[in-house]
Regions:
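Conserved P-loop NTPase-based nucleic-acid remodeling module centered on helicase motor cores
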Residues: 1-67, 211-215, 219
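Accessory N-terminal region flanking or inserted into the helicase ATPase core
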Residues: 23, 59-168, 179-182, 194, ...
Length: 238
């Protein structure tokens, strides 16, 4: 099965323990857009901020919410994490002298962009809450919620490791940080065999990174004294 389909099956088997319904509907792109639009229009008004005040149109706000919500999942981050980073950057930037006019303009651009991101973070978090309230999940939710299930349900890891004595991972260069975190939570220090080609990584647009290959040993082996076999296939037989 694909990484997402495997994660989805684990999520649905344990959905009730996470506060979700096992039959949670998978959002289509069009349904996700409509839900994000509803959040921007309704919750945006509650924030008391006009879109044009943060240099956003309705479409760019919706696109930004969807993109940011997915990125929060893909990086196992929260809106609070992003807000903390922005606050620290603002503190550091504010401490830089602005004697020169060009630098002052750069400061202004940064703070305008930071304010826009802060607004989008609030909207993205509300979008995530709305998905839960309405019984929806999307593709990134499948893996994020499965990873959460592994962390929160003690028996799940042991059950899966007993079921899968040996784990084979294909196209490993196309795994994302989220997928890798999920697989590590389940199978670190378990017999895992992965195949990947850094020259064929094609899913960078959704968070995949060929650097996962370089970090494979550190990801799945915590026992530094135990050797990990690595083989290089220099000839393609396709």
């Amino acid at each position: 099965s694909t990484y997402n389909s495997y994660a989805n099956s684990l999520f649905r088997d344990n959905a009730l323990a996470l506060g979700y319904e096992p039959e949670a509907a998978l959002l289509t792109d069009s349904s996700a857009y409509q839900l994000a639009k509803k959040v921007v229009l309704n919750f945006g008004n509650e924030l008391g901020v006009q879109l044009d005040e943060v240099d956003l149109t309705l479409k760019t706000a919706i696109d930004g919410v969807l993109k940011l919500a997915a990125e929060l999942n893909d990086n196992l981050a929260t809106g609070e994490d992003v807000a903390a980073v922005i606050a620290e950057l603002k503190r550091q930037i504010a401490a830089v002298p602005t004697k020169k006019e060009k630098l002052a303009a750069t400061h202004a651009d940064f703070f305008a962009g930071a304010f826009k991101t802060e607004v989008l973070v609030l909207l993205a978090e509300q979008y995530r809450r709305e998905k839960l309230l309405q019984g929806y999940v999307d593709y990134s939710d499948q893996v994020a919620l499965a990873e959460r299930a592994v962390r929160e349900i003690d028996s799940l890891r042991d059950t899966e490791r007993e079921l899968h004595k040996i784990v084979l991972l294909d196209e490993y260069q196309d795994t994302s940080y989220l997928q890798t975190s999920f697989l590590r939570a389940l199978y670190a220090d378990h017999p895992v065999f992965a195949v990947g080609d850094p020259n064929q990584s094609i899913y960078g647009w959704r968070g995949a990174s060929a650097t996962n290959l370089n970090e494979y040993v550190e990801t799945f082996s915590t026992d530094k004294a135990k050797p990990v076999t690595q083989l290089k296939l220099s000839t393609s037989w396709r």
